[in-house]
Amino acid sequence: MENIIKSNPYSNALISTAENPQVAQSGALAGIALAVKDNICTNEMHTTCASGILETFTSPFDATVVDLLKQEGVSIVGKANLDEFGMGSDNANSWFGPVFNPLYPDEPHTPGGSSGGSAAAVAADMCHFALGTDTGGSVRYPAAQCSVIGLKPSYGLISRHGVIAYAQSLDTVGILTKDIDLLEKVFNILNKYDPLDPTSLTPHKRAKLKPPKPHRKLTFGLVKEYNIKGISENVKMAWSQIMDELIKMGHEVVTCSIPAIKNALPAYYAIAPAEASSNFARFDGIRYGSRAPEDRGEHGTLYAPTRQEYFGNEVKRRMWLGTWNLSTDAFNHDYIRSQKIRRILQEDFDEVFNRPNVLSGNEGQKANDEPGVDFIIAPTSNCAPYPLSKLNDSAPVDTYLNDVLTVPASLTGIPSLNIPWKTKQGNVGMQIMGQYGDDLGVMKVGRLLLDKCKELHQD
């Protein structure tokens, strides 16, 4: 709590804090402090989604992930700030004000988003780990910007029950921490089938997931399409250094191509807002949440004034975009076409990986004889955190490009782990991606690289 009192007034990482967090005497997580992203339901604190429309909303139940962690003795210290409803990548779109990156105390810098509060809370040692949600990069990108570890698990492994949906075919609950061992422990607690979540991977499918093989020579993919224009020299240097170190350790690095990556970002921004526009129909101020007094006016308006007053500009922008994508004029050209691109992207990734995809009808059999890879390593962000003042000089949609490196793993549902890689110019976020269900393998590689980075910088 001392670190919260010290750091939260500047960073604004936590929207609400527990007055007297309970400390359990037993359980795998006894004595461990947790911050929960404020779009994950808790029955003892408000769940606001950083939106005015839910400013006073308290859920009658805990999300499944919260319940599982409570059973293991975790202490919840607060609810973490975010971009409203998870829409954004700078954590500047919050009803409760922006989050400032605690690594830059002299000038407000972005912590990344949308789980910026979760990442900032971990970076400032307000908690041992935090829960976030990752729809298109919202755990990995802020983890990269705040120099912490962030996991987006395989879609369906961790329950979404009690997570207020943004885009249900993409939303995943992720974990942020500084400790790779704690990350694996929390993942194993949460990696359970949940009958309350219709998208939870069934026990039958889970039984097909193979554990990572014992230590052996691995093959890492260097995907050409991730080498996009605009990547800073420092990020390129970190990427190259990691690949060199893997070769020195006896592993193999091969160059490969996933052509559909170039279409991933526009496909994401057709699919995600379309799902959001449908999900957000429930926010009308009638059944729960804030309601504008004009809603009962003489003109008979029911909920338009409430949404106008309590939704932020970015939420309204994406709802308009999503509604358009589902309209008669755009449905076939934009939405259906984007779903086809998503399928092609999944097939392209399956062609690259050695392991089969248990979700594919052919069990992931490769259509060609080219050697596959075990893991893909690429940058999480193309540059270091920038001052929040920069947002004043850019168009709102310019920040959509922040997702360009993280969206492919979201569209395909594969696990992706951000780790901080130290360079002379500061830490760089690098992501490790594996085949669907190989989350433990991804964490194993993450531990390998974190140990190597520590070894290189012992002095």
Swiss-Prot record:
<protein>
    <recommendedName>
        <fullName>Glutamyl-tRNA(Gln) amidotransferase subunit A, mitochondrial</fullName>
        <ecNumber>6.3.5.7</ecNumber>
    </recommendedName>
</protein>
<comment type="subunit">
    <text>Subunit of the heterotrimeric GatFAB amidotransferase (AdT) complex, composed of A, B and F subunits.</text>
</comment>
<feature type="active site" description="Acyl-ester intermediate">
    <location>
        <position position="138"/>
    </location>
</feature>
<dbReference type="GO" id="GO:0050567">
    <property type="term" value="F:glutaminyl-tRNA synthase (glutamine-hydrolyzing) activity"/>
</dbReference>
<dbReference type="GO" id="GO:0070681">
    <property type="term" value="P:glutaminyl-tRNAGln biosynthesis via transamidation"/>
</dbReference>
<dbReference type="InterPro" id="IPR004412">
    <property type="entry name" value="GatA"/>
</dbReference>
<comment type="similarity">
    <text>Belongs to the amidase family. GatA subfamily.</text>
</comment>
<feature type="active site" description="Charge relay system">
    <location>
        <position position="37"/>
    </location>
</feature>
<dbReference type="InterPro" id="IPR020556">
    <property type="entry name" value="Amidase_CS"/>
</dbReference>
<dbReference type="GO" id="GO:0005739">
    <property type="term" value="C:mitochondrion"/>
</dbReference>
<dbReference type="GO" id="GO:0005524">
    <property type="term" value="F:ATP binding"/>
</dbReference>
<dbReference type="InterPro" id="IPR036928">
    <property type="entry name" value="AS_sf"/>
</dbReference>
<dbReference type="Pfam" id="PF01425">
    <property type="entry name" value="Amidase"/>
</dbReference>
<dbReference type="InterPro" id="IPR023631">
    <property type="entry name" value="Amidase_dom"/>
</dbReference>
<feature type="active site" description="Charge relay system">
    <location>
        <position position="114"/>
    </location>
</feature>
<dbReference type="GO" id="GO:0032543">
    <property type="term" value="P:mitochondrial translation"/>
</dbReference>
<keyword id="KW-0436">Ligase</keyword>
<keyword id="KW-0648">Protein biosynthesis</keyword>
<dbReference type="InterPro" id="IPR000120">
    <property type="entry name" value="Amidase"/>
</dbReference>
<dbReference type="GO" id="GO:0030956">
    <property type="term" value="C:glutamyl-tRNA(Gln) amidotransferase complex"/>
</dbReference>
<keyword id="KW-0067">ATP-binding</keyword>
<keyword id="KW-0496">Mitochondrion</keyword>
<comment type="function">
    <text>Allows the formation of correctly charged Gln-tRNA(Gln) through the transamidation of misacylated Glu-tRNA(Gln) in the mitochondria. The reaction takes place in the presence of glutamine and ATP through an activated gamma-phospho-Glu-tRNA(Gln).</text>
</comment>
<keyword id="KW-0547">Nucleotide-binding</keyword>
